[in-house]
């Protein structure tokens, strides 16, 4: 009888999509703990996993933009780099709390998303991709030439926040702890993305992707959902930039070229434009 009730209560939990996300996060945290205490996996392997997770955060933004809204963007490199440089500048040059720099990145990302969203109402397809590419190239030139802000071609560095400053941990130990923060952020964003995509918001975006005329006939606002798709995409890119600088502690203009955007786009397409797991694997 006990086994029956246990199975009855546990089975729905195991089948819930969030369960897989949480288990995924716990496995990664366990790997970090093993690397920390037993030396296996090696720290280089954990850094590789962290890089994949950072790219995945940015890729999740494509789930909304390309997978559901059917909108193309090649501006991801610029948006991600801007997030990295902003948080790096605040950590390096100012005494403001880390959370303030995060809020600034999110605010700038929202503004960029709204701006590009309005542009998407006028142009679509390859023309929209070209416009976002142009915006990314403008940002790239800023990254290269605004030396006081970005360090110019030599790039900029910033000490890893939170643990190093608040708890007095060494750089190596702080980086390991930051990996756990990164995993928590990834799992949280997976849950948020899954919820939004399965909600009425996701269905409205999908209808807009399939036919803008039919979507408008059903009362779906193109303005609202295109703006939302781009805002979510740029916010995720900004968060990816935050994690990039916070974990790696260094960024240079060469990180934010067209190849960054193309590699991400390829990863999302190969893995599946509406698949979170596919984005990570891709």
Identify the residue ranges that each predicted region occupies.
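Transmembrane alpha-helices and adjacent helix-loop boundaries
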Residues: 1-282
């Amino acid at each position: 009888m006990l086994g029956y009730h246990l199975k009855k209560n546990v089975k729905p939990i195991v089948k819930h999509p969030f369960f897989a996300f949480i288990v995924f996060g716990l496995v990664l945290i366990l790997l970090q703990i093993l690397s920390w205490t037993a030396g296996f996996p090696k720290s280089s392997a954990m850094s590789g996993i962290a890089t994949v997770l950072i790219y995945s955060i940015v890729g999740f933004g494509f789930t909304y933009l390309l997978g559901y809204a059917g909108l193309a963007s090649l501006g991801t490199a610029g948006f991600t780099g801007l997030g990295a440089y902003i948080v790096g500048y605040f950590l390096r040059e100012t005494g403001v709390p880390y959370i303030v720099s995060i809020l600034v990145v999110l605010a700038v990302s929202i503004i960029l998303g709204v701006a590009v969203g309005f542009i998407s109402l006028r142009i679509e397809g390859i023309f929209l991709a070209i416009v976002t590419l142009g915006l990314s190239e403008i940002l790239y030139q800023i990254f290269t030439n605004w030396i006081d802000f970005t360090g110019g071609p030599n790039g900029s560095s910033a000490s890893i926040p939170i643990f190093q400053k608040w708890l007095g941990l060494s750089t190596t130990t702080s980086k390991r702890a930051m990996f756990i923060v990164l995993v928590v952020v990834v799992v949280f964003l997976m849950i948020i993305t899954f919820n939004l995509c399965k909600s009425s918001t996701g269905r409205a975006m999908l209808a807009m992707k399939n036919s803008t005329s039919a979507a408008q006939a059903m009362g779906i606002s193109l303005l609202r959902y295109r703006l939302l798709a781009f805002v979510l995409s740029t916010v995720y890119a900004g968060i990816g930039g935050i994690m990039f600088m916070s974990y790696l502690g260094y960024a240079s203009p060469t990180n934010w070229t067209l190849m960054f955007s193309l590699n991400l786009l390829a990863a999302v397409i190969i893995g599946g434009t509406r698949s979170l797991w596919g984005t990570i694997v891709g």
